Amino acid sequence: MNIFKNFEKKIKKSIELSDIKGKNGEDLDLSKITVDPPRDSSHGHLSTNAAMVLAKSIGLSPRALADKIIELLKNDISIENIDVAGPGFINIKLTKLFWQDAVKYMLELGLSYGRIPMGQGKRINVEYVSANPTGPMHVGHCRGAVVGDVLSNLLQFAGYNITKEYYINDAGQQIEVLAHSVLLRYREALGQKINEIPEGLYPGEYLIPLGQALAQEFGDQLLTMDRDEALSIVKERAIHTMMSMIREDLAALNIYHDIFFSERMLYADNARAIRNTINDLTLNGYIYKGKLPPPKGQNIEDWEPSEQTLFRSTNVGDDQDRVLIKSDGSYTYFAADVAYFRDKFNRHFDEMIYILGADHAGYVKRLEAMAKAISGNKAKLSVFLCQLVKLFRNGQPVRMSKRAGSFVTLRDVVEEVGRDPVRFMMLYRKCEAPLDFDFAKVTEQSKDNPIFYVQYANARCHSVFRQAQEVLHIESFSNDILITYLHRLIDDNEILLIRKLSEYPRIIEQAVVHKEPHRLAFYLYDLASCFHTHWNKGSENLNLRFIQPHDKELSFARLGLIQAVINILSSGLSIIGVEAPIEMR
């Protein structure tokens, strides 16, 4: 139950059934009416802009129209007080009975509270991570991995049928470089002295065990056999080993994809998938032979003046046409990307989501263009770019050097601070904004550490039930007992906490609509803060403590409120993919 949406519908219905019409008696456009929490909680529980957005079309001042709308709503039994504020906002205060019933509804639904059936089984493909299989995942991959995984969980929670996909870039030049790098480590394992890793090869020590494994399996056979045959063997072993490493890295973050799609599949059978894609585009007038002008402000060495096979992507919104087949007959990386999108589209997803690194910003237009061309403008596509993660330790930057092969791996971070802090903190900024990750901050036990603060709220809630068992001499508390006495929840602090709990379905809906999982992390922190504030007031005022030894009914009512907090914290943390601990020491 999204109380904000419910009241929005109620206000719209009241206006539709009233004599409030446009200047010429026409029906009004009510689509811009919203109901939200007021910015200042002292102004009421709900606030609507109805009078502000309709006044001009009616020919009244917003305040005058607000008075008319108030007349329509004032007899609603759930409303305690309704008035107009400022230029014409309508503020609504709801009855205590309404909020007590809201807790009852939360307890009846349990962990399903907030689960709005928005998706209705629609199929969405979410592609995320898709790191090159050339080494272990580093911290730069971490943010997109978490954002993609939590967004997938969020969409599933809202009723969508989600496919989590990883595209393995295993057919490009980087795989050639990987194979030569592994061969170097193989020779090293056989006893050859390698003074320095040549420029352009991967210098990381993570390839040493693979070189040793090849030496153990093949001895020196790879040195004597045909070089292409040897490279083919090394490629297969290297890709398999790197992908196993990547899967283990992702598993450390509790991330598991449904599909791992190999780029090499697109090149199978003489690149049939790519050829078919280009044939389709040709039939629709998107392919021509031509020359592209030299790129402005870029390295002219990468420009080819010869005639090539081009995709007329400017016809579908791109800023320049794209090469699909070079003059030597080889396919570009982009040709494989287009074929991959065609494969996805032919799997009949209702929407395709790409989670990419910020370095792919220039790729978005061509991705949108290929989607329009392949689908005839029918594909629904969403692209999200994740900005960089900067590592700190006690406020000091952590230095890394790609050239030297020294970088902080995803596994390093998870092993040092734990999975939960990594997952939660990667969401604690909008993905479009850079994120600072401080190893010290994410492990400290304070309000300044969001994941600790949220999990501690859940643990505190469970401690209240343990205390209740001892003080009230009751082994377990059924929903029926907790619901029976909710009418005792009348304190303003309790109502404030209920109001925050009631925002959960709205937050879920907004996070799904905008595809912004960080909204959920922010909300859980705010809910935890609201709970901790209420807890602390019990230290100052014994009457506000959750357990009242001489008043079982009030204790049961407050335990019902605590159970609602537990349910929503557990639900939200489950979507984010972190634990909801019942005890913390």
From Swiss-Prot:
Gene Ontology BP annotations: arginyl-tRNA aminoacylation
Q: What is its main location?
A: cytoplasm
Q: Which Gene3D superfamilies match?
A: Arginyl tRNA synthetase N-terminal domain, HUPs, Isoleucyl-tRNA Synthetase, Domain 1
Keywords attached to this Swiss-Prot or TrEMBL record, sorted alphabetically, are:
Aminoacyl-tRNA synthetase, ATP-binding, Cytoplasm, Ligase, Nucleotide-binding, Protein biosynthesis
Motif 'HIGH' region residues? 131-141
EC numbers for this chain: 6.1.1.19
* Catalyzed reaction equations: tRNA(Arg) + L-arginine + ATP = L-arginyl-tRNA(Arg) + AMP + diphosphate
Tell me where it resides: Cytoplasm
InterPro entries (UniProt xref):
aa-tRNA-synth_I_CS, Arg-tRNA-ligase, Arg-tRNA-synth_N, Arg-tRNA-synth_N_sf, ArgRS_core, DALR_anticod-bd, Rossmann-like_a/b/a_fold, tRNAsynth_Ia_anticodon-bd
The subunit structure is: Monomer.
What the entry lists under PANTHER family is as follows: ARGININE--TRNA LIGASE, CYTOPLASMIC, ARGINYL-TRNA SYNTHETASE
Q: What is this protein called?
A: Arginine--tRNA ligase
**UniProt organism field:** Bartonella tribocorum (strain CIP 105476 / IBS 506)
Q: Source taxonomy lineage?
A: Bacteria, Pseudomonadati, Pseudomonadota, Alphaproteobacteria, Hyphomicrobiales
* Gene from which this protein is expressed: argS
